[in-house]
Amino acid sequence: AIGGSGLTDGKFEVPEGDVNRHSGPPTYVPARNLIFLSYAMGYAEVLGATHVYIGVNSVDYSGYPDCRPEFIQKFQALANYATTATAVEGRKITIETPLQDLSKKDIVLLGTKLGAPFQFTHSCYKGGEKACGICDSCKLRLRGFAEAGVEDPIDYETREI
């Protein structure tokens, strides 16, 4: 891991319960979505795919700069110049962000409608067997399920919203 983040480096604390923070969180992983999208675009080009999907969200989120619509738009513009598929062949690979403008509540409702296997998902920043229930990600997830009126099927150490 690169380090520099509460998710990848033990020198940093994972914040608990401050979902309304207005500064960059210590759980930000440097260039994470830049790296993911770079790999995904390369793989899409090899496969001949025309779309790459990423689950970024900028409504109820922890303030990561690479989850913002502006980042996705700029990366799309860069990708249009950076791959043979787009720059030479004229075959566009479009980045799709279906969760970008949805609240956590709306994401839970959509997932429920689509039959998403929520029991196999894990959002906790602390990475334990059970979700902690107190980190930002757990709080946002729990709040989304509560607002949607849907029972969150995963195990938590504590379930305080």
Q: Which residue stretches match the model-derived regions?
A:
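ATP-dependent adenylation/nucleotidyltransferase module used to activate substrates
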Residues: 1-114
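Short cysteine/histidine-rich metal-coordination sites, predominantly Zn2+-binding motifs
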Residues: 127-128, 149-160
